Amino acid sequence: MPAPLNTFKKSLSEGETLFGCWMSIAESYTAEILGNAGFDWLLIDGEHSPNDVRSIRDQMIALKSSDSHPIIRVPVGETWIIKQMLDLGAQTILVPMVETAEQAQELVRACRYPPEGRRGVGYAVGRASGFGQIDNYGPTADAQTCLLVQVENKTGLYNLDAILAVDGVDGVFIGPADLSASLGYLGQTMHPDIQATILKTIKRISDSGKAAGILTTDDGMIQASLDAGARFVAVAMDIAMLLNTGKSIAAKWKQG
């Protein structure tokens, strides 16, 4: 039995556009709820959210029966944490702050078993292989692993073409918040200069043949990103949905 099919990677390879939601609450219960909402993918954030290995595992278990594909953003691009996430059953990894082709190449190696990579071999006791029940997991896992890298500062932009040329990088995700800060517009992701830079970057990624991704909840920017060639777009955030809905209801009934 081979490794499970990565439906997210397959859909990207077939030219589909996929819409997702950013999950920062770090709870399996909310993950399970959003897994029934109809998003193509759900991002479990290990960088800016109070997640650890066990909470990420629990959210992945909660999404097991969902059609929404879990993407795991690791806190840093280190081999040890990527290995843990893959052994837990993650098939799509998002790595923040990728600045060079050399860094991207190391990340590719971290996601692959030897001889092509340096992922540690321990799948016999891992959730990814059904705790050893998927007998052909090792030889087939690499083909079902999807690596997404984040370009989110001036250095990454400067080296974008070289990063895009790295075999094994499946997509490049734009980080608007860090990118705007790096370009001197901290907290101004909707500044016209930042938006123009983002859209040009999305087009460069798309023109290279790689999948371009972004997080934005602004309808106009979502459409502009799609028009520029974005293929996986986070159009919602769990915290924002909860907070904004709560504020709206509270304000409605407290007006008097």
Curated annotation (Swiss-Prot):
The keyword Lyase applies. The active site is at residue 48. It catalyses: D-glyceraldehyde + pyruvate = 2-dehydro-3-deoxy-L-galactonate. The record marks 73 as: Transition state stabilizer. It holds the Pfam family HpcH_HpaI. A divalent metal cation binds at residues 152, 178. PANTHER family: 2-KETO-3-DEOXY-L-RHAMNONATE ALDOLASE (PTHR30502), 5-KETO-4-DEOXY-D-GLUCARATE ALDOLASE (PTHR30502:SF4). Belongs to the HpcH/HpaI aldolase family. Aldolase which can catalyze in vitro the aldolisation reaction between hydroxypyruvate (HPA) or pyruvate (PA) and D-glyceraldehyde (D-GA). The condensation of pyruvate and D-glyceraldehyde produces 2-dehydro-3-deoxy-L-galactonate as the major product. Has weak activity with hydroxypyruvate and D-glyceraldehyde. This is Hydroxypyruvate/pyruvate aldolase. It comes from Roseobacter denitrificans (strain ATCC 33942 / OCh 114).
